[in-house]
C-alpha cells in the first residue's frame, strides 16, 4: 500500500503529485487494470508472446 505523509509546509497538491508518482512507479494502477477481469492462461500466454514479438521488431 502506498502511503504519503504531508509535511508541515507541503501543499496538498504537492503531496498528491508525490502519491501519484509513487503509485505509478510501484505499478499499482496497471496491476489493478490487468486484474480487473479474469484472463484465461491461454490468452495470457498469447498476449505475452505478442508483446515479445512487438519488442523484437520495434
UniProtKB/Swiss-Prot annotation:
A GO CC term attached to the entry: ribonucleoprotein complex
Signal peptide start-end: none
Keywords: Ribonucleoprotein, Ribosomal protein
Annotated Basic and acidic residues bias: 32-42
Family under the similarity heading: Belongs to the bacterial ribosomal protein bS21 family.
NCBIfam families noted in UniProt: S21p
BP-aspect Gene Ontology terms: translation
Name of this protein: Small ribosomal subunit protein bS21
Organism: Moorella thermoacetica (strain ATCC 39073 / JCM 9320)
Biased composition (Basic residues): 43-58
PANTHER family linked to this entry: MITOCHONDRIAL 28S RIBOSOMAL PROTEIN S21, SMALL RIBOSOMAL SUBUNIT PROTEIN BS21
Superkingdom per UniProt: Bacteria
UniProt keyword annotation of Ligase present: no
Database matches in Pfam families: Ribosomal_S21
Region (Disordered): 32-58
GO molecular function: structural constituent of ribosome
